[in-house]
From Swiss-Prot:
Role summary: Component of the large ribosomal subunit. The ribosome is a large ribonucleoprotein complex responsible for the synthesis of proteins in the cell. Binds to G-rich structures in 28S rRNA and in mRNAs. Plays a regulatory role in the translation apparatus; inhibits cell-free translation of mRNAs.
Record organism: Macaca fascicularis (Crab-eating macaque)
The protein, known as: Large ribosomal subunit protein uL30
Signal peptide: none
Database matches in InterPro entries: Ribo_uL30_ferredoxin-like_sf (IPR036919), Ribosomal_uL30 (IPR039699), Ribosomal_uL30_CS (IPR018038), Ribosomal_uL30_euk (IPR005998), Ribosomal_uL30_euk_arc (IPR035808), Ribosomal_uL30_ferredoxin-like (IPR016082), Ribosomal_uL30_N_euk (IPR012988)
Region (4 X 12 AA tandem repeats): 7-53
NCBIfam families noted in UniProt: uL30_euk
Residues modified as N6-succinyllysine: K126
Length: 247
């Protein structure tokens, strides 16, 4: 019979639908490529961070061994070994400023010590040492070691990102703010602070002032200098003990 076995015609796919499917497929490929590229970038960054950490560890160990060797050589020769002048200080505000002179108030602001038990790193030079002397009755300060710098940044470290105090929970936060200076991770940040590197100013300004706890066991005499049995002023390497009590 005529027309009885005619095949049913399949309706043609509209051009708009074909175009839509093509665009979707292209978009999917682009997304997959981007995802793969990001994955490879993260992998490369992780490897770089690991290599940097290893390099810094070696550098710190070498510095420590050099100090020990120089001290031994001096003793052997019957001399005293005088270490290099410290380049880094950690400063903690220990008193309020009611009734103080505007000069003291201004210096504390420049040091970013706006509250009691705030702490900041300071690069030591003639100008900064003079500033510390002006506010010495209101601060405790000294020379932090690598362990103290490491513990402060890892435990109490917050970054200034878009004028906000943001916890440093991810290396990506550091890379976004300081990547242009070659600082992409916590280890870079610690190294720059600890060695007072070329980008110390940028790294230090990125760090929000540390909010420390009241020291375990309390304080002795805030108004008396450390050398007289009090808490104020320069306590040199003994600042590390105070940091442990407050961190």
């Amino acid at each position: 019979m005529e027309g009885a076995e005619e095949k049913k015609k399949v309706p043609a796919v509209p051009e708009t639908l074909k175009k839509k499917r093509r665009n979707f497929a292209e978009l999917k490929i682009k997304r997959l490529r981007k995802k793969f590229a990001q994955k490879m970038l993260r992998k490369a960054r992780r490897k770089l961070i690991y290599e940097k950490a290893k390099h810094y560890h070696k550098e710190y160990r070498q510095m420590y061994r050099t100090e020990i060797r120089m001290a031994r050589m001096a003793r052997k020769a019957g001399n005293f070994y005088v270490p290099a002048e410290p380049k880094l200080a950690f400063v903690i505000r220990i008193r309020g400023i009611n009734g103080v002179s505007p000069k003291v108030r201004k210096v504390l602001q420049l040091l970013r010590l706006r509250q009691i038990f705030n702490g900041t790193f300071v690069k030591l030079n003639k100008a900064s040492i003079n500033m510390l002397r002006i506010v010495e009755p209101y601060i405790a300060w000294g020379y932090p070691n690598l362990k103290s710098v490491n513990e402060l940044i890892y435990k109490r470290g917050y970054g200034k990102i878009n004028k906000k105090r943001i916890a440093l929970t991810d290396n990506a936060l550091i890379a976004r703010s300081l990547g242009k200076y070659g600082i992409i991770c916590m280890e870079d940040l610690i190294h720059e602070i600890c060695t007072v590197g070329k980008r110390f100013k940028e790294a230090n300004n990125f760090l929000w002032p540390f909010k420390l706890s009241s020291p375990r066991g309390g304080m002795k005499k805030k108004t008396t200098h450390f050398v007289e049995g009090g808490d104020a002023g320069n306590r040199e390497d003994q600042i590390n003990r105070l940091i442990r009590r407050m961190n």
